[in-house]
């Protein structure tokens, strides 16, 4: 009896400690806000079918080029890149932008909604000019991503899911971004910043505030995902064709 009670108490303590890091898809979507606070759309004054949106002439030309990458009669295959184009033009995806994508690609609007609500990379709420996405999944967490998140919140004066008053920065937590070997890391717009310390992320934010784009990649000095001390194998060009093959073959 005592053992069971102690075990339950211990489990409850672990749950409380790790709860923020054990997140399913629905919880993540609610927390992240910008990607999709809900999997359904509800009209607001800022986001409704009458919200003005149309592609620029330049982007209409880009859409024509995108569609040509797919077989004739399969415009629907271009939903993802055309949604991305709409988001890059507008900064986020109001329902009117999704409707325009459906119109241009000649597909039912629901086919576009399905995609836009599935992928968290599509922002269905306005975000700042610099969209800071902090990975807090296990590898980054073990490399102290909490210190990175705390440094950002302190530097910008906002919490997860919020945007700075000047609309310059939006901060969210995200699941694994696939750069675990360079943890901890964040994604800002399209760029990865890796091997971070709290000081690194503060410097990156200062550069962005100054209108500069910091160099992406590791901040530790290593190249890409090579070992911190440099290569230990593949240190010279590979041998040419036929190397090691018997002369009689």
From Swiss-Prot:
GO terms for cellular component: mitochondrial inner membrane; respiratory chain complex I. The keyword Iron applies. Keywords: 2Fe-2S, Acetylation, Electron transport, Iron, Iron-sulfur, Membrane, Metal-binding, Mitochondrion, Mitochondrion inner membrane, NAD, Oxidoreductase, Phosphoprotein, Respiratory chain, Transit peptide, Translocase, Transport, Ubiquinone. CDD domains: TRX_Fd_NuoE. Binds 1 [2Fe-2S] cluster. Disulfide bonds: none annotated. It catalyses: a ubiquinone + NADH + 5 H(+)(in) = a ubiquinol + NAD(+) + 4 H(+)(out). The keyword Repeat does not apply. It is an enzyme of class 7 (translocase). Residues 1-32 form a transit peptide. The modification N6-acetyllysine is found at residue 61. Its cofactor is [2Fe-2S] cluster. It holds the Pfam family 2Fe-2S_thioredx. Residues 213-249 are annotated as: Disordered. SUPFAM superfamilies: Thioredoxin-like. Its main location: mitochondrion. The modification Phosphotyrosine is found at residue 193. It is found in: Mitochondrion inner membrane. NCBIfam families: nuoE_fam, PRK07539.1-2, PRK07539.1-5. Core subunit of the mitochondrial membrane respiratory chain NADH dehydrogenase (Complex I) which catalyzes electron transfer from NADH through the respiratory chain, using ubiquinone as an electron acceptor. Parts of the peripheral arm of the enzyme, where the electrons from NADH are accepted by flavin mononucleotide (FMN) and then passed along a chain of iron-sulfur clusters by electron tunnelling to the final acceptor ubiquinone. Contains one iron-sulfur cluster. PANTHER family: NADH DEHYDROGENASE [UBIQUINONE] FLAVOPROTEIN 2, MITOCHONDRIAL (PTHR10371:SF3), NADH DEHYDROGENASE UBIQUINONE FLAVOPROTEIN 2, MITOCHONDRIAL (PTHR10371). This is NADH dehydrogenase [ubiquinone] flavoprotein 2, mitochondrial. It comes from Pan troglodytes.
């Amino acid at each position: 009896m005592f053992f069971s009670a102690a075990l339950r108490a211990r489990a409850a303590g672990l749950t409380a400690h790790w709860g923020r890091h054990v997140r399913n898809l629905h919880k993540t979507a609610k927390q992240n806000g910008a990607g999709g606070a809900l999997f359904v759309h509800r009209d607001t004054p800022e986001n409704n079918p009458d919200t003005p949106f149309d592609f620029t002439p330049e982007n209409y030309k880009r859409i024509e080029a995108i569609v040509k990458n797919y077989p004739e009669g399969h415009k629907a295959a271009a939903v993802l890149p055309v949604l991305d184009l709409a988001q890059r033009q507008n900064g986020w995806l109001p329902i009117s932008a999704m409707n325009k994508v459906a119109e241009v690609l000649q597909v039912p609007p629901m086919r576009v909604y399905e995609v836009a609500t599935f992928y968290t990379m599509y922002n269905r709420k306005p975000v700042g000019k610099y969209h800071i996405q902090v990975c807090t999944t296990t590898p980054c967490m073990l490399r102290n991503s909490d210190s990175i998140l705390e440094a950002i919140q302190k530097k910008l004066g906002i919490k997860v899911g919020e945007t700075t008053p000047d609309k310059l920065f939006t901060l969210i937590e995200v699941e694994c971004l696939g750069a675990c070997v360079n943890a901890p890391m964040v994604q800002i717009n399209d760029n990865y910043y890796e091997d971070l310390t709290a000081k690194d992320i503060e410097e990156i934010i200062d550069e962005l505030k100054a209108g500069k784009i910091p160099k992406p990649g590791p901040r530790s000095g290593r190249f890409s995902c090579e070992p911190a001390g440099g290569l230990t194998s593949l240190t010279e060009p590979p041998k040419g064709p036929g190397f090691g093959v018997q002369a009689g073959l």
